[in-house]
């Protein structure tokens, strides 16, 4: 694994650099980089995987600013490292929001993209968007503050991979969540739901697949409809 810091605190973890095919990996928030080790390990058997660690995630000394800033940083990093096109890209939740904007801008063409429960911009009055941000912000703070709430919302028996120690993993996760600054938390929830897109998305011929879980079908209906547009 190679680590390359961005100019403003963002880090890019590189795996499988010996491969010609490239894959951009944009993870969700509230998950440490080690949570994706199994997935990235499998992908790196065939791809040069570039896993993004966002500003404000972990003890980077920086705050997360916005989806727009993140996409600019990722684009700049890729171009600075001579990557002018991607064979594949994956984005989950917040990462799906970043990938949606990345694809819409089209500065770096992508052959295939998977948006996994990706967040699309709210289409509701400003006051409702502010209330939604406040709800999400307070919910995150409560989960980060209380181990009991964390395990109630995300039961270890469901979210711990087979063969892993749930106590150790949740100890590490609880410690990780406490590294988020108030500004980072607020910016994540506002920007992920209110980021901007160009009036006319770029036409690059990317094959896009939207993933969602069995229990998310109803909740993700509006996101799927948005991406189809």
Stretches found by the model and what they are:
Residues 183-226:
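Conserved serine/cysteine hydrolase catalytic core
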Residues 50-90:
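Active-site loop/oxyanion-hole signature of alpha/beta-hydrolase fold enzymes
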Residues 10-59:
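Conserved HGGG/HGGXW glycine-rich cap/lid loop of the alpha/beta-hydrolase fold
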Residues 1-10:
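N-terminal cap/lid segment of alpha/beta-hydrolase-fold proteins
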Residues 147-166, 176, 187-193, 211-212:
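Helix-loop "lid/cap" segments that line or gate small-molecule binding pockets
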Residues 104, 110-142:
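Flexible "cap/lid" loop of the alpha/beta hydrolase fold
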Residues 38, 101-105:
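Active-site signature of alpha/beta-hydrolase-fold catalytic machinery across serine-
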Residues 91-99:
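Gly/Ala-rich beta-loop-alpha elbow adjacent to hydrolase catalytic centers
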């Amino acid at each position: 694994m190679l680590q390359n810091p961005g100019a403003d605190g963002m880090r890019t973890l590189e795996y499988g650099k010996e491969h010609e095919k490239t894959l951009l990996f944009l993870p969700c928030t509230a998950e440490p980089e080690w949570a994706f080790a199994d997935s990235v390990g499998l992908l790196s058997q065939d791809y040069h995987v570039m896993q993004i660690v966002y500003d404000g995630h972990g003890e980077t000394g920086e705050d997360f600013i916005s989806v727009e800033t993140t996409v600019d940083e990722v684009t700049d990093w890729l171009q600075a490292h001579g990557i002018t096109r991607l064979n594949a890209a994956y984005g989950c939740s917040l990462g799906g929001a970043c990938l949606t904007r990345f694809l819409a801008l089209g500065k770096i063409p992508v052959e295939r993209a998977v948006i996994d429960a990706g967040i699309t911009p709210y289409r509701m009055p400003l006051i409702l968007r502010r209330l939604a941000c406040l709800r999400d912000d307070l919910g995150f703070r409560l989960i980060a503050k209380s181990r009991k709430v964390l395990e109630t919302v995300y039961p270890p028996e469901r979210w711990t991979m087979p063969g892993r120690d749930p106590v150790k993993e949740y100890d590490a996760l609880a410690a990780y969540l406490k590294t988020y600054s108030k500004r980072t938390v607020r910016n994540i929830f506002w920007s992920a739901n209110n980021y901007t897109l160009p009036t006319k998305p770029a036409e690059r011929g990317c094959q896009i697949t939207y993933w969602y879980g069995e229990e998310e079908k109803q909740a993700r209906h509006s996101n799927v409809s948005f991406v189809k547009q």
